[in-house]
Amino acid sequence: MVSSYPLPDGFSEFDVFSLGSCLLVEGLLGILLNAVTIISFFKIRELRTPSNFLVVSLAMADIGISMNATVAGFSSFLRYWPYGSDGCQLHGFQGFTTALASIHFVAAIAWDRYHQYCTRTKLQWSSAITLAIFVWLFCAMWSAFPLIGWGEYDYEPLRTCCTLDYSKGDRNYTSYLIPMSIFNMGIQIFVVMSSYQSIAQKFKKTGNPRFNPNIPLKTLLLCWGPYGIMSFYAVFENATLVSPKLRMIAPILAKTAPTIDAFLYALGNENYRGGIWQFLTGEKIEVPQIENKSK
């Protein structure tokens, strides 16, 4: 029974229920929205383009994050992690792989949009597929290192989900965190920032903005910035001295990424939105196309 398991340190009954409910809602909503994004891609022929393949690849990564959140939400209602140490390692690996992949695909979409709007060149299928394969393998590689001793997976403060352990802040953790962050966050932030800055300048010249180029970077930093701050804080200070409730803000915000991405890159994309509408209702909507040229 739930009552037989003690509350995690620093959390009340209400805290555990509220955080568990947030994780469960985030997980189920993310699964629903990204499942619609993925199914629409395969059902509607007009959506099956190389650029949209990056969007559906992002949705696949995000649905993985949402599944991770759903498991964490369910465990929160139990008040404990029911899957043992091996389950914790698997949960950490799966969550970290999909999180890194999500960040990479956000950067890939920014890079593709830069070429669409600024250089008027079209992404080819071979490039899109190669890029997606590289992203998944690269992210899986970095996520596998903690399984073999470089870095470590352990419980979040709520002790009902697992992630990269920042509580120790030792040399092993620091030596892993710095290169991992550079190759899986720093470069991606630079790509997103520079790509959308160029797009914003292009929109300003043409006077025909197709979307708000300031939003993608802001949402990326909103979702993943708190994790980055806490991770680097642990390099210099004892992160366990920070309130457990405050430390749980990072995973809660991170798991909003799948829902935000679905609205931003699928429902917020007039071409993709039209395909989703056609899938759901059978009604086809004609949208203006970007004039591209192949390399």
Where do the protein language model's features map onto the residues?
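Cytoplasm-facing ends of alpha-helical transmembrane segments in multi-pass membrane proteins
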Residues: I31-F42, S66-T70, T97-R120, L131-I133, ...
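Loop architecture of class A 7-transmembrane GPCRs
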Residues: V2-D9, Y80-T97, A128, A140-G186
